[in-house]
């Protein structure tokens, strides 16, 4: 298997300026097969008819369904669409990627994080931006250095991770251990995540497989 065989779907706002689209764009540039789903051209994202999305067909045969937690703050329709996509995607065998970022209104992070917690058993890769790592650490009252491991243990998420651009460091807590690894060059956090999920399906198992994906 190669990156060109990796299939993923991302859901986000029609402006295409959110984290889900960014991951899709990075992955597309690496050769993955990507599709971005949003509302119709003449619809408002906050209240579009999310029932028009055929999630069963859209997620059939894909590796990853990508969502960003702050999407649910855009309105009831996006929130319902994220939930429906995760439910149907899980039934179709897709694995869920969830990005946690500090929203534009930072006080809303408790809402977006609450949604993540409510769906945490459906998530396969949970990624925190560095800003979100600090914010959730304060919200959960868990030291930042322990946060990824604590969340993985609580939620049984297979991969809980972050990337620190200044240190060129990827940190992954996974079901078989922990990995902290320095990449060859400094990457943007979402650029690293795109590389990680593009390489993870064929990088092998255990710590070595995770390390290989981290450096992909």
Language-model regions, residue ranges each:
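Ribokinase/PfkB-type carbohydrate-kinase core domain
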Residues: 1-216
């Amino acid at each position: 298997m190669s990156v060109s065989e990796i299939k993923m779907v991302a859901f986000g706002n029609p402006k295409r300026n959110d984290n889900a689209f960014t991951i899709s764009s990075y992955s597309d540039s690496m050769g993955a097969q990507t599709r971005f789903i949003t509302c119709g051209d003449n619809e408002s994202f906050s209240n579009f008819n999310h029932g028009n999305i055929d999630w069963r067909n859209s997620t059939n045969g894909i590796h990853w369904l990508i969502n960003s937690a702050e999407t649910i703050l855009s309105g009831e329709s996006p929130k319902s669409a994220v939930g429906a996509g995760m439910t149907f995607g899980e039934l179709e065998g897709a694995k869920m990627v969830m990005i946690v970022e500090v929203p534009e209104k930072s006080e809303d992070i408790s809402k977006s994080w609450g949604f993540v917690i409510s769906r945490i058993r459906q998530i396969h890769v949970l990624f925190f931006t560095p800003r979100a790592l600090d914010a959730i650490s304060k919200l959960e009252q868990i030291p930042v250095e322990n946060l990824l491991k604590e969340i993985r243990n609580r939620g049984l998420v297979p991969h809980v991770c972050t990337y620190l651009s200044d240190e060129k460091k990827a940190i992954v807590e996974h079901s078989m251990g922990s990995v902290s690894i320095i990449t060859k060059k400094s990457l943007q956090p979402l650029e690293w995540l795109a590389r990680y999920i593009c390489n993870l399906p064929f990088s092998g198992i255990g710590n070595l497989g995770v390390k290989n994906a981290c450096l992909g």
